[in-house]
Amino acid sequence: MFCPFCSIQETKVIDSRLVADGHQVRRRRECTMCKERFTTFEMAELVMPRVVKRDGSREPFNEDKLRAGLQRALEKRPVSTEQVEQCISRLKSAMRATGEREITSEYLGNLIMDALKELDKVAYVRFASVYRSFEDIREFGEEIARLGD
């Protein structure tokens, strides 16, 4: 790796440790020429499956879209940003674990609803009402009754 201070290619690793729940490696490096030290982070670049929409169109997985949907459902709920990020991480892991190049938006929606059911039941009902296009109060009641089961 090139030294960011003197641009020479000779650096050595003086310390390595796992961070971010084992998903990243933090390395402390030292330049053999100028002796400056710097930190690098390494993580696997994993390809996310494409999402097949209900109309048959395909689009790349968009983490920002997922985050926005979760935050909308969780608005004014007692759920921390850290919990949301952990939820996103688990959802992405579940998507990759399918081993598929493409997943349906229906499958993704069901994954999200399962995650929200565990995280916050009110947010789950909010998300389900939009995702399942509830038409009237009866459908809300039925979904809430299913939560009690």
Swiss-Prot record:
Single Gene Ontology BP term?
Answer: negative regulation of DNA-templated transcription
Q: Which domain of life is it from?
A: Bacteria
Q: Give UniProt keywords alphabetically.
A: ATP-binding, DNA-binding, Metal-binding, Nucleotide-binding, Repressor, Transcription, Transcription regulation, Zinc, Zinc-finger
Report the stretches of sequence that form zinc fingers (unnamed).
3-34
The record's InterPro entries line, in alphabetical order, gives: ATP-cone_dom, NrdR-like_N, RNR_NrdR-like
Q: Which residues form the ATP-cone domain?
A: 49-139
Q: Which family does it belong to?
A: Belongs to the NrdR family.
Q: What is this protein called?
A: Transcriptional repressor NrdR
Q: Which gene encodes it?
A: nrdR
